[in-house]
Regions:
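Peripheral, non-catalytic segments flanking oxidoreductase cores
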Residues: 1-298
Protein backbone atom coordinates (compact mmCIF):
# COMPACT_ATOMS: atom_id res chain seq x y z
CA UNK A 1 0.00 0.00 0.00
CA UNK A 2 1.40 3.35 -1.03
CA UNK A 3 0.58 6.86 0.03
CA UNK A 4 -1.03 8.14 -3.14
CA UNK A 5 -3.43 10.64 -1.66
CA UNK A 6 -3.31 14.09 -3.31
CA UNK A 7 -1.20 16.93 -1.92
CA UNK A 8 -2.78 20.40 -1.95
CA UNK A 9 -0.79 23.63 -1.58
CA UNK A 10 -3.01 25.95 0.47
CA UNK A 11 -1.01 29.04 -0.52
CA UNK A 12 -1.80 28.41 -4.19
CA UNK A 13 -5.51 27.61 -3.87
CA UNK A 14 -6.45 30.80 -5.70
CA UNK A 15 -4.66 29.37 -8.73
CA UNK A 16 -7.03 27.67 -11.17
CA UNK A 17 -4.85 24.58 -11.52
CA UNK A 18 -4.58 24.05 -7.75
CA UNK A 19 -8.34 24.65 -7.43
CA UNK A 20 -8.99 21.88 -9.94
CA UNK A 21 -6.62 19.60 -8.01
CA UNK A 22 -8.65 20.33 -4.87
CA UNK A 23 -11.93 19.47 -6.58
CA UNK A 24 -10.46 16.26 -7.99
CA UNK A 25 -9.18 15.33 -4.53
CA UNK A 26 -12.61 15.95 -2.99
CA UNK A 27 -14.45 14.00 -5.67
CA UNK A 28 -12.09 11.07 -6.17
CA UNK A 29 -10.45 10.63 -2.75
CA UNK A 30 -12.33 12.56 -0.07
CA UNK A 31 -8.92 12.95 1.54
CA UNK A 32 -5.85 15.08 0.87
CA UNK A 33 -2.66 16.23 2.52
CA UNK A 34 -2.14 20.00 2.82
CA UNK A 35 1.15 21.89 2.74
CA UNK A 36 1.87 25.61 3.25
CA UNK A 37 -1.17 25.73 5.53
CA UNK A 38 0.15 28.64 7.66
CA UNK A 39 -0.33 26.85 11.00
CA UNK A 40 3.06 27.36 12.71
CA UNK A 41 5.06 24.17 13.18
CA UNK A 42 6.04 25.35 16.66
CA UNK A 43 2.35 25.65 17.59
CA UNK A 44 1.65 22.17 16.23
CA UNK A 45 4.52 20.79 18.31
CA UNK A 46 3.31 22.56 21.46
CA UNK A 47 -0.25 21.30 20.89
CA UNK A 48 1.06 17.75 20.66
CA UNK A 49 2.95 18.20 23.94
CA UNK A 50 -0.20 19.53 25.62
CA UNK A 51 -2.19 16.59 24.22
CA UNK A 52 0.30 14.08 25.58
CA UNK A 53 0.25 15.72 29.01
CA UNK A 54 -3.55 15.77 29.22
CA UNK A 55 -3.94 12.18 28.05
CA UNK A 56 -1.34 11.09 30.62
CA UNK A 57 -3.51 12.46 33.45
CA UNK A 58 -5.02 9.96 35.92
CA UNK A 59 -8.22 8.34 34.70
CA UNK A 60 -10.19 9.87 37.60
CA UNK A 61 -9.37 13.34 36.24
CA UNK A 62 -9.96 12.45 32.59
CA UNK A 63 -13.44 11.20 33.49
CA UNK A 64 -14.32 14.79 34.44
CA UNK A 65 -14.30 15.58 30.70
CA UNK A 66 -18.06 15.06 30.32
CA UNK A 67 -20.03 14.68 27.10
CA UNK A 68 -21.95 17.69 25.79
CA UNK A 69 -23.26 15.46 23.03
CA UNK A 70 -22.64 11.71 22.97
CA UNK A 71 -18.98 11.04 22.29
CA UNK A 72 -17.74 14.60 22.71
CA UNK A 73 -16.01 14.09 26.08
CA UNK A 74 -13.62 11.49 27.47
CA UNK A 75 -13.60 8.15 25.69
CA UNK A 76 -12.03 5.36 27.70
CA UNK A 77 -10.74 2.16 26.06
CA UNK A 78 -13.76 -0.03 25.25
CA UNK A 79 -14.60 -3.51 24.00
CA UNK A 80 -14.96 -2.09 20.48
CA UNK A 81 -11.79 0.03 20.59
CA UNK A 82 -9.66 -1.37 23.45
CA UNK A 83 -6.45 0.39 22.35
CA UNK A 84 -7.96 3.87 22.01
CA UNK A 85 -8.83 6.72 24.35
CA UNK A 86 -9.59 10.39 23.75
CA UNK A 87 -10.43 13.72 25.32
CA UNK A 88 -12.53 16.32 23.57
CA UNK A 89 -14.69 19.40 23.54
CA UNK A 90 -17.77 20.02 21.44
CA UNK A 91 -17.31 23.59 20.18
CA UNK A 92 -13.73 24.78 19.76
CA UNK A 93 -14.81 28.36 19.08
CA UNK A 94 -16.83 28.76 22.28
CA UNK A 95 -14.95 30.43 25.14
CA UNK A 96 -17.40 28.90 27.63
CA UNK A 97 -16.85 25.38 26.27
CA UNK A 98 -13.10 25.95 26.41
CA UNK A 99 -13.39 27.20 29.99
CA UNK A 100 -15.40 24.12 30.98
CA UNK A 101 -12.86 21.79 29.38
CA UNK A 102 -9.94 23.51 31.10
CA UNK A 103 -11.69 23.44 34.47
CA UNK A 104 -12.55 19.76 34.16
CA UNK A 105 -8.93 18.77 33.56
CA UNK A 106 -7.11 21.37 35.68
CA UNK A 107 -5.48 22.75 32.53
CA UNK A 108 -2.65 25.19 33.23
CA UNK A 109 -2.83 28.77 31.91
CA UNK A 110 -0.06 27.99 29.42
CA UNK A 111 -1.80 24.84 28.17
CA UNK A 112 -4.99 26.83 27.69
CA UNK A 113 -3.07 29.51 25.81
CA UNK A 114 -1.70 26.87 23.43
CA UNK A 115 -5.13 25.31 22.92
CA UNK A 116 -6.76 28.65 22.18
CA UNK A 117 -4.05 29.66 19.70
CA UNK A 118 -4.20 26.27 18.00
CA UNK A 119 -8.00 26.30 17.93
CA UNK A 120 -8.07 29.74 16.32
CA UNK A 121 -5.51 28.77 13.67
CA UNK A 122 -7.18 25.46 12.79
CA UNK A 123 -10.69 26.97 12.72
CA UNK A 124 -9.53 29.68 10.32
CA UNK A 125 -7.91 26.99 8.17
CA UNK A 126 -11.06 24.84 8.17
CA UNK A 127 -13.19 27.81 7.09
CA UNK A 128 -10.73 28.66 4.31
CA UNK A 129 -10.63 25.10 3.01
CA UNK A 130 -14.43 24.91 3.09
CA UNK A 131 -14.66 28.12 1.08
CA UNK A 132 -12.12 26.87 -1.47
CA UNK A 133 -13.96 23.56 -1.77
CA UNK A 134 -17.14 25.51 -2.53
CA UNK A 135 -15.34 27.74 -5.03
CA UNK A 136 -14.00 24.65 -6.81
CA UNK A 137 -17.65 23.84 -7.55
CA UNK A 138 -18.38 27.39 -8.73
CA UNK A 139 -20.01 28.52 -5.48
CA UNK A 140 -18.64 31.85 -4.26
CA UNK A 141 -19.49 33.46 -0.94
CA UNK A 142 -20.23 30.21 0.95
CA UNK A 143 -19.97 30.95 4.66
CA UNK A 144 -18.65 28.30 7.05
CA UNK A 145 -17.56 30.74 9.76
CA UNK A 146 -20.29 29.79 12.23
CA UNK A 147 -20.17 26.03 11.70
CA UNK A 148 -19.07 24.51 15.05
CA UNK A 149 -15.79 22.61 15.21
CA UNK A 150 -15.51 19.64 17.55
CA UNK A 151 -12.01 18.99 18.91
CA UNK A 152 -10.51 15.67 19.96
CA UNK A 153 -7.08 14.53 21.10
CA UNK A 154 -6.43 10.82 20.65
CA UNK A 155 -4.10 8.27 22.20
CA UNK A 156 -3.50 4.75 20.93
CA UNK A 157 -1.95 2.25 23.34
CA UNK A 158 -0.11 0.13 20.78
CA UNK A 159 1.76 -2.83 22.31
CA UNK A 160 3.63 -5.78 20.76
CA UNK A 161 0.56 -7.98 21.26
CA UNK A 162 -1.64 -5.38 19.53
CA UNK A 163 0.23 -5.41 16.21
CA UNK A 164 -2.28 -6.18 13.46
CA UNK A 165 -5.23 -5.04 15.59
CA UNK A 166 -7.37 -1.99 14.93
CA UNK A 167 -6.92 1.14 17.01
CA UNK A 168 -10.16 2.58 15.65
CA UNK A 169 -12.75 0.69 13.61
CA UNK A 170 -13.56 1.60 10.01
CA UNK A 171 -15.83 4.67 9.82
CA UNK A 172 -16.67 7.87 8.02
CA UNK A 173 -16.79 11.17 9.87
CA UNK A 174 -20.30 12.52 10.32
CA UNK A 175 -19.42 16.16 9.68
CA UNK A 176 -18.28 18.28 6.73
CA UNK A 177 -14.50 18.05 7.00
CA UNK A 178 -11.85 16.96 9.49
CA UNK A 179 -8.39 18.46 9.86
CA UNK A 180 -6.04 15.89 11.34
CA UNK A 181 -2.63 16.50 12.84
CA UNK A 182 -1.38 12.95 12.75
CA UNK A 183 1.45 11.44 14.77
CA UNK A 184 4.69 12.30 12.98
CA UNK A 185 6.55 9.17 13.97
CA UNK A 186 3.94 6.42 14.45
CA UNK A 187 1.80 5.52 11.45
CA UNK A 188 -1.35 3.42 11.19
CA UNK A 189 -3.94 5.57 9.40
CA UNK A 190 -5.55 3.88 6.41
CA UNK A 191 -8.23 5.15 4.04
CA UNK A 192 -10.45 3.28 1.60
CA UNK A 193 -10.27 4.56 -1.98
CA UNK A 194 -13.18 4.47 -4.43
CA UNK A 195 -12.20 1.04 -5.70
CA UNK A 196 -12.52 -0.32 -2.17
CA UNK A 197 -8.80 -0.82 -1.49
CA UNK A 198 -7.06 0.26 1.69
CA UNK A 199 -4.38 2.93 1.19
CA UNK A 200 -1.84 3.61 3.92
CA UNK A 201 -1.30 7.25 4.91
CA UNK A 202 2.13 7.39 6.57
CA UNK A 203 3.38 10.27 8.73
CA UNK A 204 4.77 13.34 6.95
CA UNK A 205 6.38 16.12 8.98
CA UNK A 206 4.69 19.51 9.03
CA UNK A 207 1.65 18.59 6.98
CA UNK A 208 -2.00 18.23 7.94
CA UNK A 209 -4.59 15.82 6.58
CA UNK A 210 -8.12 16.69 5.52
CA UNK A 211 -10.86 14.04 5.44
CA UNK A 212 -14.32 14.72 4.04
CA UNK A 213 -17.31 13.41 5.98
CA UNK A 214 -20.96 12.59 5.30
CA UNK A 215 -22.09 16.23 5.36
CA UNK A 216 -19.66 17.09 2.54
CA UNK A 217 -21.32 14.46 0.37
CA UNK A 218 -24.77 15.89 1.08
CA UNK A 219 -23.72 19.54 0.72
CA UNK A 220 -22.09 18.85 -2.67
CA UNK A 221 -25.17 16.90 -3.82
CA UNK A 222 -23.17 13.70 -4.08
CA UNK A 223 -20.12 15.11 -5.86
CA UNK A 224 -17.69 14.89 -2.93
CA UNK A 225 -16.55 11.54 -1.53
CA UNK A 226 -17.02 10.76 2.17
CA UNK A 227 -13.91 8.73 2.87
CA UNK A 228 -13.89 5.65 5.08
CA UNK A 229 -10.84 5.31 7.29
CA UNK A 230 -9.41 3.38 10.23
CA UNK A 231 -6.30 3.21 12.39
CA UNK A 232 -4.32 -0.03 12.54
CA UNK A 233 -1.55 -0.95 14.94
CA UNK A 234 1.62 -1.55 12.94
CA UNK A 235 4.24 -1.10 15.65
CA UNK A 236 4.51 -1.22 19.44
CA UNK A 237 4.55 2.51 20.17
CA UNK A 238 2.18 5.00 21.77
CA UNK A 239 0.45 7.02 19.03
CA UNK A 240 -1.14 10.47 19.37
CA UNK A 241 -3.25 12.49 16.96
CA UNK A 242 -5.24 15.73 17.09
CA UNK A 243 -8.50 16.06 15.16
CA UNK A 244 -10.72 19.06 14.49
CA UNK A 245 -14.13 18.25 13.00
CA UNK A 246 -16.09 20.99 11.21
CA UNK A 247 -19.57 19.55 11.71
CA UNK A 248 -22.50 21.28 10.01
CA UNK A 249 -24.56 24.47 10.14
CA UNK A 250 -25.16 25.72 13.67
CA UNK A 251 -28.62 26.86 12.60
CA UNK A 252 -30.85 25.59 9.83
CA UNK A 253 -30.64 22.53 7.63
CA UNK A 254 -27.88 20.62 5.95
CA UNK A 255 -28.70 20.76 2.25
CA UNK A 256 -27.02 21.24 -1.09
CA UNK A 257 -26.92 24.89 -2.26
CA UNK A 258 -29.27 25.66 -5.13
CA UNK A 259 -26.26 25.96 -7.45
CA UNK A 260 -25.69 22.23 -6.99
CA UNK A 261 -29.20 21.28 -8.11
CA UNK A 262 -30.53 21.31 -11.69
CA UNK A 263 -32.40 19.12 -14.17
CA UNK A 264 -29.41 16.83 -14.65
CA UNK A 265 -28.51 16.85 -10.95
CA UNK A 266 -31.72 16.55 -8.89
CA UNK A 267 -31.45 16.99 -5.14
CA UNK A 268 -30.21 13.66 -3.76
CA UNK A 269 -30.90 14.10 -0.04
CA UNK A 270 -33.73 15.59 1.95
CA UNK A 271 -32.75 18.59 4.10
CA UNK A 272 -32.00 17.71 7.73
CA UNK A 273 -30.55 19.11 10.93
CA UNK A 274 -26.99 17.96 11.58
CA UNK A 275 -27.61 16.92 15.18
CA UNK A 276 -30.57 14.76 14.11
CA UNK A 277 -28.34 13.05 11.57
CA UNK A 278 -25.62 12.44 14.15
CA UNK A 279 -28.18 10.83 16.47
CA UNK A 280 -29.47 8.71 13.57
CA UNK A 281 -25.98 7.35 12.91
CA UNK A 282 -25.59 6.43 16.57
CA UNK A 283 -29.05 4.89 17.04
CA UNK A 284 -28.82 2.81 13.85
CA UNK A 285 -25.15 1.94 14.48
CA UNK A 286 -24.35 3.09 10.96
CA UNK A 287 -20.82 4.46 11.11
CA UNK A 288 -19.57 4.09 7.53
CA UNK A 289 -21.93 6.42 5.68
CA UNK A 290 -24.91 4.07 5.34
CA UNK A 291 -27.20 6.45 7.26
CA UNK A 292 -27.21 8.79 4.27
CA UNK A 293 -29.20 6.22 2.32
CA UNK A 294 -32.05 6.66 4.81
CA UNK A 295 -32.25 10.31 3.76
CA UNK A 296 -31.86 9.81 0.03
CA UNK A 297 -34.50 11.16 -2.34
CA UNK A 298 -33.17 9.55 -5.51
Amino acid sequence: MEDTIPVIDVENLSDQTEGKKLRDACEKWGCFRIINHSTPLTLMAEMKRVSEALLDLPVEIKKNNKDVIAGSGYKAPSDVNPLYEALGLYDLGSSQVMQDFCSQLNVTPYQRQVMEAYGKAIHELAVKIGEKMAESLGIFGADFEDWPCQFRINKYHFTPKAIGSLGVQLHTDSGFLTILQDDESVGGLEIVNQSGSFVSVPPFHGTLLVNLGDIAKVWSNGRFFNVKHRVQCKEAAIRFSIATFMLGPRKGNVEAPIEMVDHDHPRLYQPFVYEDFRKLRVSKKMHTGEALELLRLW
